[in-house]
């Protein structure tokens, strides 16, 4: 048992040495440029020199913005004229017409219960239009059953 383990360890070490040799950079390849560290006590040298760095909002700034939004929400409940959300709500609740994007009601909801019972007994359905009633066949086709 110990012999098997020692053979496996030797194989792993052999593979590792081959891998290390393979991954070593050759003398012909150029490596990354060396990093130059300049130590200084100046405050300006401690600032990042990247122009792409964007300062993040601090936690107190975020809390202040949240508090301001809460205050404006409270003002809207007091003065509904100034609140845009309230005016939009009134616009849709006062207008009796449905928006054009709304799906129309299905006809089975508009048909009275008495007519529906009659359709179930006879098995024939009629649809009313301006000309009168038009037979459509069985109620199964309309989905009334």
Curated annotation (Swiss-Prot):
- Output compositional bias ranges, type Basic and acidic residues: 1-27
Q: State the residue spans of region: Disordered.
A: 1-58
For bias type Polar residues, the affected ranges are 38-52
Q: What Pfam families does the record point to? A: BCOR (PF15808)
| Protein family per UniProt | Belongs to the BCOR family.
Q: What PANTHER family has UniProt attached to this entry?
A: AGAP007537-PB, BCL-6 COREPRESSOR
Name of the featured protein: Putative BCoR-like protein 2
Task: Give the species.
Answer: Homo sapiens (Human)
